[in-house]
Every structure is written in C-alpha cells, then in structure tokens.
Amino acid sequence: MWPLSHRHLCLAFLLVCVLSAISFFLHIHQDSIRHGLGLSVLCPDRRLVTPPVAIFCLPGTPMSPNTSSPCPQNSASLSGTWTIYPDGRFGNQMGQYATLLALAQLNGRRAFILPAMHAALAPVFRITLPVLAPEVDSRTPWRELRLHDWMSEEYADLGDPFLKLSGFPCSWTFFHHLREQIRSEFTLHDHLREEAQSVLRRLRLGRSGDQPRTFVGVHVRRGDYLQVMPQRWKGVVGNGAYLREAMDWFRARHEAPVFVVTSNGMDWCRENIDASKGDVMFAGDGQEASPWKDFALLTQCNHTIMTIGTFGFWAAYLAGGDTVYLANFTLPDSEFLKIFKPEAAFLPEWVGINADLSPLWTLAEP
C-alpha cells in the first residue's frame, strides 16, 4: 500500500469539511425544505410560486370550525390570497365578510380578513376567517376589484390569485347558497346570546301579564339617514304609518306577538309608535358605538320588521321567520337605484310594504 502524501491528507481533510458543512446546512433547513420554502433559501433571487402568508394568530380566531388551533398547520398549501377592505359600520362589514367568504370559495381561493374587520366582528361572532398581517398586506401584489351590490356572472370566474375586494356588498345573491355556513360564522358568543334571551324572558304582555311566545324584532333606522336619504338619494326612512301597518300584518297572522323595538332613535320611537295595546316593548339602548346588544336582541326574536339599512337586513337574515321590510323608499329617478337592486337586497319570501313618498314630492315642488 502506497503511503498517503501530505497533499493527499490535506485534500481528504478539506473534503470531509465540505461534506460536514453541507450536512449541517441541510439539517438546520430541513423543515423549510420539507414545507416548500427551501427554494427561497437556496435560490433567494427566484420568486416563489406560492409566497408565504403571514397571519395574526389572534385569540378566538380558529382556522376552521373543526379545529381548536388558531394557527394554520401548513400555510404553504394555500391557493392564493383574497381579502376585502373593511369599510362602513357593523352591518356593512358583515356583508363584506360574507361576500368575501362566498366569492373566495366559489373561485377556489383562501380568504383572509384585515385586522379592522376582525376588531369589529370578532367580539360579537365566532368568525373563523384568519387575519392577514399588515406587513403581508403592504407587500402583496394585489389586484383591486370594487364590487357592486349584486352577484354577477364575472364574479364566478376571477382568476386573480391576489385579490383585494372593496365596496359595500350585502346582497343575498352572493352567499345565500351558503346560508347555514354564514349563519354559523355569525353565531353570537354565548354571553351575548344569553343576555339577549334573558331580556326576552323578562318581557310580559301589558294587558294579561302573560309571557309572550312570539317575538317580533323591530329595527328602526334613524340617525344620519334622516339627512342622507332625502338630500342625497331622494328617499325616505320608515315612518310611524309604515311601522303600524307592519305590526298589524304580524298581529293578523300570529297570536299575541310582542314587538321588541330597537333603534338609533329611541326617543322618536317612543313618541311615534303606538304602545297602547301593551304588546310593544322599547328594549333597545340605541348605542351606535356598541350595537351588538341591540343586534343580539333582534337575532333572538322569531320574526323581524326592518326599515332600511344593512343592520336590519342581517338581523332579519339571522333571525329567520317572517320579515317585513320598507319597499320602494326612493323616487324612481333616484341615483340610489344605480347601486341598489331591491330584488337582490330582499329575499323573495320577505314581505314589502311601500313607503310613503309624499314628503319627497313636497320637497320637489318649487
């Protein structure tokens, strides 16, 4: 056997060092390589086909109804990233959430909500969509799409992997095929449901003192709509005559109903709703900054009377039962009808009562 030269020994030592270094490198990066992220380590200048998605693992936001873990097991398997810009008030953001969920499922994409929407909805509902981190939102190459408020054929074939929706969608045509899933997403937290049911249990019919068996939630939208509807949209809000007719509709069809009135104008309601029959309860607190108490009350009722607005829509949609709504509440030439289709806003089985537009005709006179 030929003795190894000093040069051969040096080369062998260098080879062992190189192999050891490669082995160590592969060991420390084995998890990344196994989950598809090793490509960015080995070839940092090459774009990943599916970039990693960061989320907030916030308390009370499980990834799916069937898991108790708030964090995903494998975010690299996601197909695209869709979100929606949170805008407007409580009912608006419920509509945006439901529409995002439905359109993302329809197009085979993964839906995420932004932190502001989580802050608005998670204290009230057991929502399950994960939350997109701001740093991911800021560096994602979004294509933006503003939605109108009814389902369109083109929304069923959106090929964009990174899509940020916007607008004020709140039409059943987007999500009604997923009604049970939507109702599950908007399940009240236990303490809110129990508090609302406790209020209803304490109610008594004024004349007999009996506990009512049929509760009709009444939502009367006032506030800024008193100016916005006539001045901007050539429209009206529900008046006392409409509410009286709607209540009489329920009195004719249900035995001894009690009407649970909520509003952001409770003083007006007490002055304009006839409570002499003993079946009207002014139960709402009218706090616009914390609407969930009134909303919880409405959803625990059997039926609904709504005026206008997304808050009333969602109360009726989640409560089920019969719903009476204010119909034809704008003039025929209102710009509002360009962004609002009544047939897409109200379920076909709901009952509409025409609004009194005479105050608008008076305003239109020279």
Curated annotation (Swiss-Prot):
Keyword set, alphabetical order: Glycoprotein, Glycosyltransferase, Golgi apparatus, Lipid metabolism, Membrane, Signal-anchor, Transferase, Transmembrane, Transmembrane helix
Described function: Catalyzes the transfer of L-fucose, from a guanosine diphosphate-beta-L-fucose, to the terminal galactose residue of glycoconjugates through an alpha(1,2) linkage leading to H antigen synthesis that is an intermediate substrate in the synthesis of ABO blood group antigens. H antigen is essential for maturation of the glomerular layer of the main olfactory bulb, in cell migration and early cell-cell contacts during tumor associated angiogenesis. Preferentially fucosylates soluble lactose and to a lesser extent fucosylates glycolipids gangliosides GA1 and GM1a.
GO MF annotation list: alpha-(1,2)-fucosyltransferase activity; galactoside 2-alpha-L-fucosyltransferase activity
Residues on Lumenal side: 26-366
Pfam families, sorted: Glyco_transf_11
Homology family: Belongs to the glycosyltransferase 11 family.
GO biological process: carbohydrate metabolic process; fucosylation; lipid metabolic process; olfactory bulb development; positive regulation of cell-matrix adhesion; positive regulation of endothelial cell migration; positive regulation of endothelial cell-matrix adhesion via fibronectin; positive regulation of sprouting angiogenesis
Alphabetized InterPro entries for the sequence: Glyco_trans_11
One GO term describing the cellular component: Golgi cisterna membrane
UniProt pathway annotation: Protein modification; protein glycosylation
Reactions performed catalytically: a beta-D-galactosyl-(1->4)-N-acetyl-beta-D-glucosaminyl derivative + GDP-beta-L-fucose = an alpha-L-Fuc-(1->2)-beta-D-Gal-(1->4)-beta-D-GlcNAc derivative + GDP + H(+); a ganglioside GA1 + GDP-beta-L-fucose = a ganglioside Fuc-GA1 + GDP + H(+); a beta-D-Gal-(1->3)-beta-D-GlcNAc-(1->3)-beta-D-Gal-(1->4)-beta-D-Glc-(1<->1')-Cer(d18:1(4E)) + GDP-beta-L-fucose = alpha-L-fucosyl-(1->2)- beta-D-galactosyl-(1->3)-N-acetyl-beta-D-glucosaminyl-(1->3)-beta-D-galactosyl-(1->4)-beta-D-glucosyl-(1<->1')-N-acylsphing-4-enine + GDP + H(+); a neolactoside nLc4Cer(d18:1(4E)) + GDP-beta-L-fucose = a neolactoside IV(2)-alpha-Fuc-nLc4Cer(d18:1(4E)) + GDP + H(+)
Chief location category: Golgi
Membrane side Cytoplasmic: residue ranges: 1-8
EC numbers on record: 2.4.1.69, 2.4.1.344
Protein name: Galactoside alpha-(1,2)-fucosyltransferase 1
Residue stretches spanning the membrane: 9-25
Membrane topology reported for the UniProt record: Single-pass type II membrane protein
Glycosylated position list: N66, N302, N328
The keyword Nucleotide-binding is annotated on this UniProt entry: no
